[in-house]
């Protein structure tokens, strides 16, 4: 929805908590059975981190996090899709209707960045130098084979992080991974990406590359920087969590195992 501010919510239309309306104001709203998810659903059919609702700055995207049981959007299997007012999301015994209020006429207009897009990042695997170019609006990084970038590393969660664009800037968010995502050696839940940043997912490292002449965090052409998000985008506050208990693309595997990489890098005869 262009211009203005709008507040999305999920309303439970089937399952425990029927009729409840849950505001989703975060850049990344997580739904799953793991503590820390904004919407905590306790049921065997719900994965620990099952669904991400992602705000790009102009659209809301729903992304199934490579789950075994899956998620349905308007009764069709979901991978990544834009959700609109009235969209229906189904996972386990729950059904949610997306409610997106029209822009508030009193609210200030969103800032418009008149500079060219910083472009899509390419990730360079620092072990193999292999390049990965995300092709989806939300790129999944993790251990599960259904991830866009699948990493064979026991320290990597099934889905560890998601890569997407927020206000046309490349960002990455940790999705409650057991080993924290690191950017340039620092644990981060959410970060804007810059040229030559090093992303650490478990013991696997990627260097961020942007097209030549492009910078990922320059001020907008109107002299106002594009809105910046903080780690609060994914940090869960106890009072902000909703706990509900039930009554009852393209895939680029990181081919070389880390052990093989370590052996290849050892000097001959060692």
Model segments located where?
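Regulatory inter-domain linker segments that are low-complexity and enriched
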Residues: 1-8, 94-159, 164-168, 190, ...
């Amino acid at each position: 929805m262009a211009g203005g501010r709008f507040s999305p919510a999920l309303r439970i239309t089937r399952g425990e908590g029927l009729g409840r309306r849950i505001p989703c104001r975060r850049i990344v709203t997580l739904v799953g059975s793991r503590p820390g998810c904004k919407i905590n659903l306790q049921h065997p059919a719900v994965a620990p981190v099952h669904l991400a609702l992602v705000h790009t700055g102009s659209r809301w995207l729903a992304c199934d996090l490579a789950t075994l049981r899956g998620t349905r959007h308007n009764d069709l299997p979901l991978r990544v899709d834009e959700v609109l007012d009235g969209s229906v999301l189904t996972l386990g015994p729950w059904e949610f209707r997306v409610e997106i209020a029209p822009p508030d006429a009193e609210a200030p207009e969103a800032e418009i960045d008149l500079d060219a897009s910083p472009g899509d990042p390419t990730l360079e695997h620092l072990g193999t130098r292999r390049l990965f170019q995300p092709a989806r609006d939300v790129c999944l990084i993790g251990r599960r084979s259904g991830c866009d970038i699948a990493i064979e590393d026991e320290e990597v969660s099934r889905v560890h992080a998601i890569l997407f664009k927020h206000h046309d800037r490349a960002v990455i968010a940790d999705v409650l991974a057991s080993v924290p995502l690191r950017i340039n050696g620092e644990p981060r839940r959410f970060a804007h990406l810059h040229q030559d940043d090093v992303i650490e997912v478990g013991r696997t490292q990627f260097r961020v590359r942007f097209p030549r002449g492009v910078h990922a965090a320059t001020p907008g052409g109107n002299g106002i920087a594009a809105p910046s998000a903080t780690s609060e985008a994914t940090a869960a506050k106890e009072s902000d969590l909703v706990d509900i208990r039930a009554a009852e693309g393209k895939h680029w595997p990181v081919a070389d195992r880390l052990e093989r990489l370590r052996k290849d890098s050892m000097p001959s005869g060692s």
